[in-house]
UniProtKB/Swiss-Prot annotation:
The gene is ATP5F1D. Residues 1-22 form a transit peptide. This is ATP synthase F(1) complex subunit delta, mitochondrial. Disulfide bonds: none annotated. Subunit delta, of the mitochondrial membrane ATP synthase complex (F(1)F(0) ATP synthase or Complex V) that produces ATP from ADP in the presence of a proton gradient across the membrane which is generated by electron transport complexes of the respiratory chain. ATP synthase complex consist of a soluble F(1) head domain - the catalytic core - and a membrane F(1) domain - the membrane proton channel. These two domains are linked by a central stalk rotating inside the F(1) region and a stationary peripheral stalk. GO terms for molecular function: proton transmembrane transporter activity; proton-transporting ATP synthase activity, rotational mechanism; structural molecule activity. Component of the ATP synthase complex composed at least of ATP5F1A/subunit alpha, ATP5F1B/subunit beta, ATP5MC1/subunit c (homooctomer), MT-ATP6/subunit a, MT-ATP8/subunit 8, ATP5ME/subunit e, ATP5MF/subunit f, ATP5MG/subunit g, ATP5MK/subunit k, ATP5MJ/subunit j, ATP5F1C/subunit gamma, ATP5F1D/subunit delta, ATP5F1E/subunit epsilon, ATP5PF/subunit F6, ATP5PB/subunit b, ATP5PD/subunit d, ATP5PO/subunit OSCP. NCBIfam families: ATP_synt_epsi. Gene3D superfamilies: ATP synthase delta/epsilon subunit, C-terminal domain, F0F1 ATP synthase delta/epsilon subunit, N-terminal.
Amino acid sequence: MLPSALLRRPGLGRLVRQVRLYAEAAAAQAPAAGPGQMSFTFASPTQVFFNSANVRQVDVPTQTGAFGILAAHVPTLQVLRPGLVVVHAEDGTTSKYFVSSGSVTVNADSSVQLLAEEAVTLDMLDLGAAKANLEKAQSELLGAADEATRAEIQIRIEANEALVKALE
């Protein structure tokens, strides 16, 4: 089988090689940060946590799995799931935040934007309350009358499970 980069052009009777230039164009763009640096913006509707700050790494929970972002990461757009965002500063310190949902965009110029529906630092959360909310939601799920109610309760369960995991 021929590689997908080779296509037969109708009417020409010969093979033509197609070339992807995206990587070259992305590399030619001016970086948002210096070489080996990553510009990070992280905000919720009520608060800005980082605004174009240079960081070493960001770990994010997404619908397709958790992953770490470093400078020169492949461009991507992902939907966040409830979980822990860990920001590794250039000085070696880490900051941990719980996010409920949102999106993360990784650009070719090593800039990253994380927009969260809700986000709080871990020290603002109470493990006991998260466990109590989880137990309450699990018991409510057993008595849910319709599919819509079950779906809403399941979302609460997933969020509280992620909270408990982040705090333990």
